Amino acid sequence: SAIKKIKNKIDTVFMISPLTDNKRIKKIAKSTTGFIYAVSRLGVTGARSNLEKSTLILIKRIRKFTNKPTCVGFGISKPEHVKSIIKAGADGVIVGSAIVDLIAENINNEEKMLNYIYAYIKSMKVATISHKNLSI
């Protein structure tokens, strides 16, 4: 059936927060079939100016138990955040609110909005690869 085909192609993605204990990290690492979503901080999502040190500690804790892909989200909004996160051992970042803000700020000018979004995403992508000395 179509539903069975879809079910077989959807990976599980579990979240790990700074408060998740090591026993649970091991269980999540074993159970996830997609990637691990590392929550950078407690509270709600939204762009933040600073990256908390606990985020980098969390990435290193996760890496003690698994090499499964790990992406960090919640408050990631600057290329400097991305560089630190990748350097700490994560595979990627999840950015939402910062892009939503660009849309909201430029809602009446689609071309400008798309140009800003493109430039922003490019700056974030460059930050993921500049740490590894790769090129786009």
Predicted features and spans:
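C-terminal helical cap(s) of enzyme catalytic domains, especially alpha/beta-barrels
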Residues: 86, 98-134
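Hydrophobic faces of well-ordered beta-strands that scaffold small-molecule active sites
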Residues: 12-16, 36-38, 70-74, 93-95
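Generic structural signal for well-ordered alpha-helices
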Residues: 3, 25-26, 56-60, 82, ...
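Glycine-enriched alpha-helix->loop->beta-strand junction motifs that scaffold or abut catalytic
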Residues: 6-13, 30-36, 87-92
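Glycine/Thr-rich beta-alpha phosphate-binding loop at enzyme active sites
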Residues: 15, 25-64, 102-106
